[in-house]
Amino acid sequence: LSEAEWSSFAEEVRVLRRMGVSAISTDLWWGLVEGRQAGLFDWSYYDRLVELLARHDMHWVPILSFHQAGGNVNDDFMQTIPLWLWGKLLELHPELGSVRDLQYVSETGDTSMEYVSLWADSYVMPYYKSFISAFRDHFAGWTHLIDEVNLSLGPAGELRYPSYNAHDWGNYPNRGTLQCYSPLAEQDWRRYVKEKYQSI
């Protein structure tokens, strides 16, 4: 934000506080904080935010957002998840054939980069945990100001498939597109069928 935008925000916080509002909730974007490389955290934006809130006796409800901002209804801000993540996971896990293993792949063959597919949870979970731990440690001195912490997972922060997002047909409403065509999703389906019926 520019200095003018910070000043405008401070005035809005003052007005809200006078009206009796005691806390505000903001997204805390994983890609903004850890976007440059794994384990390198830049909390400067959120440090300034928390200091501003504290000056106005306003509490904070951070939403740890592990998805992309932008590309959905009413989005006016763009922030990807950490782009290094895709290459890092491929480097550490040679059994993964390509980035498509980690992404939702639709029936039309399109992929979504806004969130790591649920079929790749075991690969990305250590990075989620690391980020949550880093958040906890960094803001330990502000716990009196934090009323609760929310996790925002899945496309647009909703635990759902990206079945009607812009990477596919892009219009809403429609029936949506199936998102179960990544190699990991297909392996999971085969495993399920074999366990249930003993053969494919």
Predicted regions and their residues:
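Aromatic-lined substrate-binding rim segments of carbohydrate-active enzymes
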Residues: 6-101, 125-143, 147
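Polysaccharide-binding and catalytic clefts of secreted carbohydrate-active enzymes
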Residues: 87-200
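Active-site mouth loops of central-metabolism enzymes
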Residues: 1-7, 120
